[in-house]
Amino acid sequence: MAIVTWTGATSGSLTTTGNWLDGALPVNNAHVIVPSWATNGMTSNLNWPEVALSSFHVQAGFTKNIGVSASGSSFANSFLEVSLAGTNADLPQRFAYEGTGNLARIHIKASTANTSYQVLNTGSGANGHPALQLMSDDLAAMGDILILRGEVSLGPEGSLLDVDNIIVGSPPTSTGLSSSSARVWIGSGVNAVDDSDLETLTVSSGTVSVDCNVDTINLHGGNVLQTSGNVVTALNLYTGGVYEMANPQTTGSVHTVAKLNLYGGTLTNERNPTAKTITAADLYSGTILDPAAKLTWGDSTVYKGKATDVNFDFGPNRTIRIT
């Protein structure tokens, strides 16, 4: 079992042996730990010789940066490159981040389907950038991503991120502890490993902005903001969740929910009250806010519970279109 620990004792260079405990650079199947007591962040030679790691863990209390701030032609080279295609039976295959620096840019170069991705916390970002930013190559496999707390950008600035399932937040516990909270941005370059639409987004708390197509959104709590003219194949909205059809209408780009299953919660078209489409809906209970009456409803809109269990606000003197 090879556990390799970053110290950053002399600089932020990943290829300097003096920056690793006992001078041991990572090797294939190693478990890399970035501890709270590291002297420097990981900020140079970010495309270090690629080895297939089994895990990469940025521990709580690490306050330094990973990667550097850059844009334009230098953007892609500002990320730390990490391959998580290794296997090691002694410890689980895992990416875990709980550092609190104001910038961590990480590029997943390879992965396995068994590698879990967990964001337990982040710092607060600077200069308008989320604290943790993740992108990837076109991957053959990828584990699910769980985000509990912090600021996370998936596929920033339109970059690629291959992942099938994203889980954000956690509900209140039975002991009365409050739910976790995260702020997540899902970019237009996020898609499934097979290059189809993102398969599932499950949200229990926090706020998530979505700029890509999604097969299924399960919204149990927190807020989901659709910020582009994308398509959601199925939206399952439960008590405690708020779904905002927030994108402004643009030519040839009208946000569409192909099937709404309203079990509770609130669907709203208030932030940018422009034309959007709900092709089909099963309405059990909940609230729909469309004060400018800009939603177009398909003819497969069905009350599954009592009509009085669904609260509508279409504004005064409106004509509602069911096509």
Predicted regions and their residues:
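Extracellular beta-sheet-rich ligand-binding/adhesion modules
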Residues: 1-285, 290-299, 303-306, 311-323
